[in-house]
């Protein structure tokens, strides 16, 4: 287009110069000017029509425009908050490094999650305590790793020596008639049992409403016990269908469980819900197990749904779970520890994994002695012997007379005072024989 216009201009200018030199009239100039202009306009109109065809009319949507503007503003705010968080995290990192240089108890490596927890703490003393706790935990972790390494090295040395001895003595046995069971097949079998329990098994509820009644350390310990309980349940022959009731999303319980399971939380065969156990099951079937209950659990009922409070055993808050059960009008029960164990001193609080092992054993066998063997020996002095009480069925008069005569004989034969049982305090028998009395001498006769 531009090339055509320039070409026309050059032709027109050359024509004007020739006409002026020859002395022609101006009418020809006007005609040539109109002709050149009309050609130029025709070309431009044609191009405009093509542009109009290629670019159709688009109507502007105001709501879309508003949403785009809002999203841009939100993104800008997000970027600002992220930059602020990064700056605050960097400041906390610098503060931790300064305290480390000052010689305070600070861990050598700290994660972003720990830095965020450190930022949320309100006071300086709380931050110091948390850093000290992290440093102590780090030292314990390193000590454990060193011990494991030493044990592995010692085991490897012993195994190498044993292998050398066996090679010298006997040849290796490669073939066997026993079928090797792989770990993968065992895992699939356990998962299949858990799936069947989730479909047809007896429910067991863990009440997750005690988050505010525990510190962070106690909550982490509780989550560890919950994971052990899930493992024992998965490995049992007849597992429970475990429910985590009142587990709020993004709560401390939920965050710690997701963190400990390392991406496998969605694959765990457990029903986690934010509803309470009262909303999930009928109240008539619920029994809350608590150590403060006045009712003793005499036998395991397969039709009931037992509830265990997710409290760590170190958090000895007496009456907390019992008050929660009474508030909801639920039946309560406690394990018969006094009846079967010599438990004189100390709180009767057990860990969550011990509770589920006791309940699994009761479910399979119904034997209290076998079930209570999972209670640690440091908490009691052994099993209590059953009292050997001989009960007589007295139905006739002869039986009544026999009982009365035995009672009289016992009263006659009891010759001991109440304050002692030694032989020096035995009462002498009274005799009515006067000859024996006459032979005895008085104290005034002995002097004469």
Swiss-Prot record:
Disulfide bonding pattern of the chain: none
A GO CC term attached to the entry: mitochondrial nucleoid
GO biological process, one term: methylation
Enzyme kind, highest EC tier: transferase
The protein's role, per its UniProt record: Mitochondrial tRNA N(1)-methyltransferase involved in mitochondrial tRNA maturation. Component of mitochondrial ribonuclease P, which cleaves tRNA molecules in their 5'-ends. Together with hsd17b10/mrpp2, forms a subcomplex of the mitochondrial ribonuclease P, named MRPP1-MRPP2 subcomplex, which displays functions that are independent of the ribonuclease P activity. The MRPP1-MRPP2 subcomplex catalyzes the formation of N(1)-methylguanine and N(1)-methyladenine at position 9 (m1G9 and m1A9, respectively) in tRNAs; trmt10c/mrpp1 acting as the catalytic N(1)-methyltransferase subunit.
Quaternary structure and interacting proteins, as annotated: Component of mitochondrial ribonuclease P. Interacts with HSD17B10/MRPP2.
Keyword Metal-binding recorded: no
Region entry Disordered, spans: 144-167, 429-448
Annotated keywords: Coiled coil, Methyltransferase, Mitochondrion, Mitochondrion nucleoid, S-adenosyl-L-methionine, Transferase, Transit peptide, tRNA processing
Substrates-to-products reaction catalysed: adenosine(9) in tRNA + S-adenosyl-L-methionine = N(1)-methyladenosine(9) in tRNA + S-adenosyl-L-homocysteine + H(+); guanosine(9) in tRNA + S-adenosyl-L-methionine = N(1)-methylguanosine(9) in tRNA + S-adenosyl-L-homocysteine + H(+); an adenosine in mRNA + S-adenosyl-L-methionine = an N(1)-methyladenosine in mRNA + S-adenosyl-L-homocysteine + H(+)
Molecular-function GO term, any one: tRNA (adenine(9)-N1)-methyltransferase activity
Name assigned to this protein: tRNA methyltransferase 10 homolog C
EC number: 2.1.1.-, 2.1.1.218, 2.1.1.221
Transit peptide: 1-48
Subcellular location: Mitochondrion matrix, Mitochondrion nucleoid
Residue ranges of coiled coil: 137-165
Span of domain SAM-dependent MTase TRM10-type: 190-382
Stated family: Belongs to the class IV-like SAM-binding methyltransferase superfamily. TRM10 family.
């Amino acid at each position: 287009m531009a090339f055509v216009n320039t070409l026309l201009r050059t032709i027109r200018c050359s024509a004007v110069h020739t006409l002026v030199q020859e002395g022609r009239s101006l009418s020809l100039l006007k005609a040539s000017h109109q002709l050149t202009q009309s050609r130029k306009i025709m070309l431009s109109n044609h191009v405009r029509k093509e542009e109009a065809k290629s670019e159709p009319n688009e109507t502007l949507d105001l709501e879309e425009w508003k949403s785009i503007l809002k999203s841009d503003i939100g993104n800008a705010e997000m970027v600002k908050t992220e930059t602020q968080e990064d700056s605050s995290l960097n400041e906390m990192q610098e503060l931790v490094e300064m305290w480390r240089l000052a010689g305070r108890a600070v861990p050598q490596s700290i994660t972003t999650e720990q830095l965020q927890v450190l930022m949320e703490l309100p006071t300086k003393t709380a931050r110091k305590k948390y850093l000290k706790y992290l440093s102590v935990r780090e030292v314990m972790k390193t000590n454990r790793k060193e011990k494991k390494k030493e044990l592995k090295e010692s085991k490897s040395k012993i195994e190498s020596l044993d292998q050398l001895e066996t090679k010298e003595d006997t040849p290796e046995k490669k073939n066997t008639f026993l079928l090797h069971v792989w770990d993968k097949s065992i895992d699939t079998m356990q998962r299949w049992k858990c799936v069947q329990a989730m479909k047809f098994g007896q429910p067991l509820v863990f009440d997750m409403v005690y988050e505010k009644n525990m510190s962070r350390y106690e909550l982490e310990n509780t989550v560890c016990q919950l994971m052990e309980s899930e493992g024992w349940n998965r490995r049992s022959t007849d597992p429970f269908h475990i429910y985590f009731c009142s587990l709020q999303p993004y709560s401390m319980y939920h965050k710690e469980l997701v963190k400990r399971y390392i991406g496998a939380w969605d694959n765990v065969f457990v029903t986690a819900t934010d509803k309470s156990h009262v909303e999930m099951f009928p109240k008539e079937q619920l029994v809350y197990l608590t150590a403060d209950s006045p009712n003793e659990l005499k036998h395991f009922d397969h039709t009931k749904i037992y509830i265990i409070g997710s409290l760590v055993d170190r958090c000895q808050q007496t009456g907390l779970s019992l008050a929660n059960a009474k508030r909801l009008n639920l039946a309560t029960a406690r394990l018969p520890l006094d009846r079967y164990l010599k438990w004189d001193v100390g709180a009767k609080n057990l860990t969550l994994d011990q509770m589920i092992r006791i309940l699994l054993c009761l479910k399979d066998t119904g034997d209290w002695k076998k079930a209570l063997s999972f209670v640690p020996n440091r908490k009691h002095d052994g099993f209590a012997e059953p009292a050997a009480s001989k009960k007589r069925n007295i139905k006739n008069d002869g039986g009544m007379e026999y009982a009365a005569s035995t009672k009289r004989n016992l009263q006659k034969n009891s010759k001991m005072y109440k304050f002692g049982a030694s032989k020096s305090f035995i009462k002498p028998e009274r005799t009515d024989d006067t000859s024996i009395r006459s032979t005895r001498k008085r104290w005034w006769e002995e002097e004469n």
